[in-house]
């Protein structure tokens, strides 16, 4: 304890200006480059994730393709992080593009050339100066082979995909360094990228892509003459034929009602000729609900709402009513040259059914 007191006392006895100067010189940390927890080396173009962990840009790129999560805390990496990374030192990227020597190494991208990172450039220059025919490079967790004779690079386990490389002066126009664009303009960044670990510009072209129109799933209706009509706009020929059929039905309704057998109390009900025939409805949304309400209005003639229901009604009438009181057997021609048989069945209070075909 005495030693600690003496240390504190000696520090307090120092002059004020000297303490300030020494504190500045001793405590001011030098700008050290952080180490990457993925490659276990000094970070090259360090970037900071949203979780504040720092890695090499290419190391993050390789890790994001494998798991899309931080290598330390497993927090999810945003989808657009590779296109809009958070660089700790943007000035370092510009300095790397200027280079330290006269020559630099480049790999081919879309509409331009990319400069290799500082570490990879040193490896390539060292192999080239020693006269090697090829050398291996570890980029974003993938092993690449640089063929220095044919000046191409490819993955060691995928020889089919090759990319040109070259050794050129440092001042040539370039797109960026190691997949990082020198012009970090949001308008020039395309979010659709392929899996290219070397940071090449492998953006898929989307300008020619067009939006395909949605195909309607509604099946069109078929008119009487076989032509396709829209569900919302029924065929005018079909509507006209139905109206003519019901008009003919109204004229022959009196004779049909008189010839049919009448039960007790039916004299008080109106005949179909004195009632008003409802207008036909060709809406596809309607169902057979009107057929169940015939007993409530015995004088009303039930109008069927589609040609399919009319044909089903004719087949049912042939099975349930063998003896019909009247059958006109006349078919009306429609616009397409075909014929249609319209049948309407009415129910009377005594349970008998009267079927009239037009």
Swiss-Prot record:
Reaction catalysis annotation: S-ubiquitinyl-[E2 ubiquitin-conjugating enzyme]-L-cysteine + [acceptor protein]-L-lysine = [E2 ubiquitin-conjugating enzyme]-L-cysteine + N(6)-ubiquitinyl-[acceptor protein]-L-lysine
Enzyme type, top EC level: transferase
Single GO BP term: Wnt signaling pathway
Pathway(s) the chain acts in: Protein modification; protein ubiquitination
Keyword field: Cytoplasm, Isopeptide bond, Metal-binding, Nucleus, Phosphoprotein, Transferase, Ubl conjugation, Ubl conjugation pathway, Wnt signaling pathway, Zinc, Zinc-finger
Gene3D superfamilies: 3.30.720.50, Zinc/RING finger domain, C3HC4 (zinc finger)
Cross-link Glycyl lysine isopeptide (Lys-Gly) (interchain with G-Cter in ubiquitin) per UniProt, renumbered positions: 84, 94, 130, 175
Alphabetical list of InterPro entries matching this protein: RING-HC_RNF146, RNF146, WWE-dom_subgr, WWE_dom, WWE_dom_sf, Znf_RING, Znf_RING/FYVE/PHD, Znf_RING_CS
Gene Ontology molecular function terms on file: poly-ADP-D-ribose binding; ubiquitin protein ligase activity; ubiquitin-protein transferase activity; zinc ion binding
UniProt GO cellular component terms: cytosol; nucleus
Residue(s) carrying Phosphoserine: 289, 293
Main location as per UniProt: cytoplasm
Positions of the WWE domain: 91-167
UniProt binding sites for a glycoprotein: 107, 110, 114, 144, 153, 163, 175
Bias-annotated ranges (Acidic residues): 283-297
Keyword Zinc-finger: yes
Subcellular location: Cytoplasm, Cytosol; Nucleus
Superkingdom per UniProt: Eukaryota
Post-translational modification, as annotated: Ubiquitinated; autoubiquitinated. Autoubiquitination is enhanced upon poly(ADP-ribose)-binding.
EC number of this enzyme: 2.3.2.27
Functional summary from the UniProt entry: E3 ubiquitin-protein ligase that specifically binds poly-ADP-ribosylated (PARsylated) proteins and mediates their ubiquitination and subsequent degradation. May regulate many important biological processes, such as cell survival and DNA damage response. Acts as an activator of the Wnt signaling pathway by mediating the ubiquitination of PARsylated AXIN1 and AXIN2, 2 key components of the beta-catenin destruction complex. Acts in cooperation with tankyrase proteins (TNKS and TNKS2), which mediate PARsylation of target proteins AXIN1, AXIN2, BLZF1, CASC3, TNKS and TNKS2.
Notes on the domains: The WWE domain mediates non-covalent poly(ADP-ribose)-binding.
PANTHER family in UniProt: E3 UBIQUITIN-PROTEIN LIGASE RNF146
Complex and partners: Can form homooligomers. Interacts with PARsylated AXIN1, AXIN2, BLZF1, CASC3, H1-2, IPO7, LIG3, NCL, PARP1, XRCC1, XRCC5 and XRCC6. Interacts with DDB1, DHX15, IQGAP1, LRPPRC, PARP2, PRKDC, RUVBL2, TNKS1 and TNKS2. Binding often leads to interactor ubiquitination, in the presence of the appropriate E1 and E2 enzymes, and proteasomal degradation.
UniProt protein name: E3 ubiquitin-protein ligase RNF146
């Amino acid at each position: 304890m005495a030693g600690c007191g003496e240390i504190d006392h000696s520090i307090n006895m120092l002059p004020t200006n000297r303490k300030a100067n020494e504190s500045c010189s001793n405590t001011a940390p030098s700008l050290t480059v952080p180490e990457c927890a993925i490659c276990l080396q000094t970070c090259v173009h360090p970037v900071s994730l949203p979780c504040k962990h720092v890695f090499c840009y290419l190391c993050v790129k390789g890790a994001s393709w494998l798991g899309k999560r931080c290598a330390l805390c497993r927090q999810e990496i945003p989808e657009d992080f590779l296109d809009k990374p958070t660089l700790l030192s943007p000035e370092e990227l510009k300095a790397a593009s200027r280079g330290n020597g006269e020559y630099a190494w480049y790999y081919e991208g879309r509409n331009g050339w990319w400069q290799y990172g500082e570490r990879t450039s040193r490896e390539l220059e060292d192999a080239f100066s020693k006269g090697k025919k090829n050398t291996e490079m570890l980029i974003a967790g993938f092993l690449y082979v640089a063929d220095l004779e044919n000046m191409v690079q490819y993955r060691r386990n995928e020889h089919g995909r090759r990319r040109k490389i070259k050794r050129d002066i440092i001042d040539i126009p370039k797109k960026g360094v190691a997949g990082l664009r020198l012009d970090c303009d949001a308008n020039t960044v395309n979010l659709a990228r392929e899996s290219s670990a070397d940071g090449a510009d492998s953006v898929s072209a989307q300008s020619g892509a067009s939006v395909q129109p949605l195909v309607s799933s509604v099946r069109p209706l078929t008119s009487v003459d076989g032509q396709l009509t829209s569900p919302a706009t029924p065929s005018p020929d079909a509507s006209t034929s139905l109206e003519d059929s019901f008009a003919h039905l109204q004229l022959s309704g009196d004779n049909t009602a008189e010839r049919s057998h009448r039960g007790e109390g039916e004299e008080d009900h109106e005949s179909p000729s004195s009632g008003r025939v409802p207008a036909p409805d060709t809406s596809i949304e309607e169902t057979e609900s009107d057929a169940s309400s015939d007993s409530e209005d015995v004088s009303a003639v039930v109008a069927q709402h589609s040609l399919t229901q009319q044909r089903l009604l004719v087949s049912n009438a042939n099975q349930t009513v063998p003896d019909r009181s009247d059958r006109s057997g006349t078919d009306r021609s429609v616009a397409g040259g075909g014929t249609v048989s319209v049948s309407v069945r009415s129910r009377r209070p005594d349970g008998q059914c009267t079927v009239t075909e037009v």
